[in-house]
Design a protein with these regions (language model features):
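Active-site region of glycoside hydrolase catalytic domains
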Residues: 2-44, 48, 93, 115-270
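Alpha-helical protein-protein interaction elements
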Residues: 9-11, 34, 53-56, 77, ...
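A common structural microfeature
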Residues: 16-18, 61, 78
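Aromatic- and Gly/Pro-rich amphipathic surface segment
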Residues: 38-74
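Glycine-/proline-rich flexible loop or hinge segments
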Residues: 45-56, 86-98, 139
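Glycine-rich anion/phosphate-binding loops
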Residues: 55-65, 99-112, 145-160
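Aromatic-lined substrate-binding rim segments of carbohydrate-active enzymes
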Residues: 66-132, 226
Length: 270
């Protein structure tokens, strides 16, 4: 639906610097993997006691206004808000013959939280996938090409619904910033190399490249879907990316020589 107000980008040729915080829906919202609650791929790990149960988590789903107020007081200008696929396309079962319906109330709930984010002067940066997926996809969802299609359907439905509600219900412009996948390199390595994330695969390193390929294909699919939607609706061009984890390993390679040289340089190691 076309809006009646100006959705054009700022005439400025440079993007503003954003200073903010980042969240994951599963890690902060609460309300997952309990009785009668949506299940994601950590459900079995929680039941087996290999990780703590989610429980109420940080209660973001009910106390988001307090978090936004705290961010505003700290002078932040952005809030990276993670959407939980398992809430948006939920099932209390861990095995299904077909994907379940999308929960429009959940999508409306996320829209309301994004609108509240903006009311507090925070630019929303929306993460569409942060390590977790619905349990009905199986533990090793990213080893199958079908997950690319399922992810595309999720992205298309979610982005279209939330933005149209932002425009029609809240009289706000569409979302400008998206992260399709949070740290896909860590998702793969923690699942198939270090074993920190749940998996049923016995292939180990043999699962790494198939999972990478499917995740990158899913990113491209999401990128194109979002841009195509915005173009067809006449919305301002969005910024869509993924973020990867990188680390400076100086400490593991050089720090010992720094410590050994302290005495030579008359520096107190304390």
């Amino acid at each position: 639906m076309q809006s009646n107000f100006n959705l054009s980008p700022s005439p400025s040729t440079t993007e503003p610097f954003l200073w903010g915080v980042a969240t994951s829906g599963y890690q902060i919202e609460g309300g997952y993997n309990g009785e009668g609650e949506p299940k994601n791929n950590w459900f079995l790990s929680e039941q087996r006691g290999s990780v703590m149960k989610t429980g109420a988590a940080a209660e973001f789903w009910t106390r988001y206004e307090e978090d936004f107020q705290a961010c505003q007081k700290m002078g932040l200008t952005a809030f990276r808000l993670g959407l939980e696929w398992a809430r948006i396309q939920p099932s209390t079962e861990i095995s299904l013959s077909a994907p379940p319906a999308f929960d429009l109330d959940a999508l409306d709930g996320y829209t309301d939280r994004i609108a509240a984010c903006r009311r507090h002067g925070l630019e929303p940066v929306i993460t569409l996938h942060h390590f977790t997926h619905p349990a009905w996809l199986g533990l090793d969802a990213w080893l199958t090409e079908d997950t690319i299609d399922r992810f595309g359907e999720y992205v298309q439905t979610t982005v279209a619904h939330i933005n149209r509600r932002l425009i029609d219900h809240h009289q706000l412009a569409p979302i400008h910033w998206y992260i399709t996948l949070n740290e896909p390199n860590i998702l793969v390595s923690n699942t198939y190399l270090s074993g920190q994330f749940p998996t049923d695969s016995m292939l180990g390193i043999g699962s790494v490249f198939p999972a990478y390929n499917h995740l990158l294909a899913a990113h491209v699919r999401a990128y194109n879907l979002i841009h195509d939607l915005y173009e067809s609706e006449g919305w301002a061009t969005p910024r869509v990316s993924l973020n990867t984890y990188c680390s400076d390993l100086y400490w593991s390679e050089k720090v010992i020589w720094d410590l050994l040289s302290l005495r030579l340089r008359s520096v107190d190691p304390a």
